[in-house]
């Protein structure tokens, strides 16, 4: 029997506000344990939450970017549960009326086709703290993350393969990043994914029993975990077994999923309206203000790169996959850089350097200005493409002007025949055996002189000019 895969994803995204959702404490990642906390985060008696307007701004932008309807009458709810990283014993979230609902996003699949994936809801909530278990037998609680603003985006169960889930996450990350509401860095926990997957016989409308997958710390692991679950569940069903409703985690080392807990039924969180936060309304004016702040999104930007700048579909897709890279490209082209040349450098030498150094574009000293200047001095013959690679590494590590560095470092390409011809004659004088081979008609003997000349000029001879002059002087040599 063949089965159809049914997948839905729940994505938690940390919003990039300066302070937390209900307290003035910093929401910055990476500080010492419990440095970003105050009495609200610790849930001292008598303290009251105050809603951060910037969180609602981000929620509105997310809803608009994901083609969602908005609940204009806003309220929050208490989700009750006890856990050490949750000192209040409840989480402030949204239950029956999330800020956004009934949305969709279009994704591009590997075969070039597109598919519209529904988004059931997006609700605002506070993050919990973090438990760590020490080797000394004690467990520790870090509340830096407690109260960091989240938006949870819940898809419809519209995905029918791990490939579609991967494509959905890629598109969602792009939209969220371009909207400017999160840096969506999975390695820092600012984007976290839970997956729900079930199988059903083809033609059956009723969903099968679902399994929830956790510990999916990269898009690649989401895909691998889902692929394993498809295989595991299919084997159980084909052997006459039944799927249990359970939560499993992905084991990256063994590329399997491991049982965490069996779900006997839906958890009863005893939701009720949050009494410490008043109801409020999102006005049409507020919504339109947020709409005007939304940028051009990846799909539109890709189309413009192809139609206006003459880039290929592949190049346009690669450049727009990351907003930082795309914005860098935009500025470089606006400064007069050739779109194809800038694209080639960003996808070639720049990408290789970033991978080797383990850094992002923001973490190096390369700027649109010095990249455009470097491309210009390649075009005008000041440096060769080979020398440019060395210049780029210097700019990436140290910044500064490309032309200034080239001149100070003595890297300017030699193009003047008055300088090159005497060097060519000296090469002939220094390599009598090669000259004899050439004069005797030995095959490919002339090619040796190219290497001799480049060595004599330390690679600074303009290849086009040097080869033309070398051919000219070799012809004279043969006549004599």
From Swiss-Prot:
- EC number(s) recorded for this UniProt protein: 6.3.5.-
Q: A GO term (biological process) for this protein?
A: glutaminyl-tRNAGln biosynthesis via transamidation
Residue spans crossing the bilayer: none
Pfam families hit by this protein = GatB_N, GatB_Yqey
User: What highest taxon heads this organism's lineage?
Assistant: Bacteria
Q: Which reaction does it catalyse?
A: L-glutamyl-tRNA(Gln) + L-glutamine + ATP + H2O = L-glutaminyl-tRNA(Gln) + L-glutamate + ADP + phosphate + H(+); L-aspartyl-tRNA(Asn) + L-glutamine + ATP + H2O = L-asparaginyl-tRNA(Asn) + L-glutamate + ADP + phosphate + 2 H(+)
Recorded coiled-coil stretches? none
Q: Do you know which PROSITE patterns this protein is assigned to?
A: GATB
Subunit details: Heterotrimer of A, B and C subunits.
Q: Which family does it belong to?
A: Belongs to the GatB/GatE family. GatB subfamily.
Give the function comment from the record: Allows the formation of correctly charged Asn-tRNA(Asn) or Gln-tRNA(Gln) through the transamidation of misacylated Asp-tRNA(Asn) or Glu-tRNA(Gln) in organisms which lack either or both of asparaginyl-tRNA or glutaminyl-tRNA synthetases. The reaction takes place in the presence of glutamine and ATP through an activated phospho-Asp-tRNA(Asn) or phospho-Glu-tRNA(Gln).
Q: What is this protein called?
A: Aspartyl/glutamyl-tRNA(Asn/Gln) amidotransferase subunit B
Which gene carries the instructions for this protein? gatB
């Amino acid at each position: 029997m063949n089965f159809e895969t049914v997948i839905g994803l729940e994505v938690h995204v940390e919003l990039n506000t300066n302070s937390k959702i209900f307290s003035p404490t910093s929401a910055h990642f990476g500080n010492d344990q419990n440095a970003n906390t105050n009495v609200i985060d610790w849930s001292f008696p008598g303290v009251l939450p105050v809603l951060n307007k910037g969180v609602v701004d981000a929620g509105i932008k997310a809803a608009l970017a994901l083609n969602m309807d908005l609940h204009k009458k806003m309220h929050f709810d208490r989700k009750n549960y006890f856990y050490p990283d949750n000192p209040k014993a409840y989480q402030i979230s949204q239950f029956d009326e999330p800020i956004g609902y009934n949305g969709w996003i279009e994704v591009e699949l590997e075969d070039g086709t597109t598919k519209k994936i529904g988004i059931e809801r997006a609700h605002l909530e506070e993050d919990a703290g973090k438990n760590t278990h020490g080797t000394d037998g004690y467990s520790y609680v870090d509340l830096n993350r407690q109260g960091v603003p989240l938006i949870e985006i819940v898809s419809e169960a519209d995905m029918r393969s791990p490939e579609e889930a991967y494509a959905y996450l890629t598109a969602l990350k792009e939209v969220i990043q371009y909207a400017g509401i999160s840096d969506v860095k999975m390695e820092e926990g600012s984007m976290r994914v839970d997956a729900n997957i079930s199988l059903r016989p083809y033609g059956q409308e009723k969903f099968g029993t679902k399994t929830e997958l956790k510990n999916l710390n990269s898009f690649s692991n989401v895909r691998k975990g889902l692929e394993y679950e498809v295989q595991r569940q299919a084997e159980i069903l084909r052997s006459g077994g039944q799927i249990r409703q359970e939560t499993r985690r992905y084991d990256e080392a063994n590329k399997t999923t491991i049982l965490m807990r069996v779900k006997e039924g839906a958890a009863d969180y005893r939701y009720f309206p949050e009494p410490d936060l008043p109801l409020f309304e999102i006005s049409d004016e507020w919504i339109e203000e947020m709409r005007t702040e939304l940028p051009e999104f990846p799909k539109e930007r890709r189309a413009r790169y192809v139609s206006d700048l003459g880039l290929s579909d592949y190049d346009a897709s690669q450049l727009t996959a990351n907003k930082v890279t795309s914005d860098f490209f935009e500025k470089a082209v606006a400064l007069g850089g050739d779109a194809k040349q800038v694209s080639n450098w960003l996808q070639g030498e720049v990408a290789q350097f970033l991978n080797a150094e383990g850094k992002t574009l923001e973490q190096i000293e390369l700027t649109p200005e010095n990249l455009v200047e470097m491309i210009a001095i390649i075009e005008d013959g000041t440096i060769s493409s080979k020398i440019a690679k060395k210049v780029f590494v210097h700019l990436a590590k140290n910044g500064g002007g490309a032309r200034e560095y080239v001149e100070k470092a003595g890297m300017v390409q030699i193009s003047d025949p008055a300088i090159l011809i005497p060097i060519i004659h000296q090469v002939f004088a220094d390599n009598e055996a090669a000259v004899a081979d050439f004069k005797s008609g030995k095959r490919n003997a002339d090619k040796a002189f190219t290497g001799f000349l480049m060595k004599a000029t330390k690679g600074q001879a303009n290849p086009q000019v040097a080869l033309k002059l070398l051919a000219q002087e070799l012809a004279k040599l043969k006549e004599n």
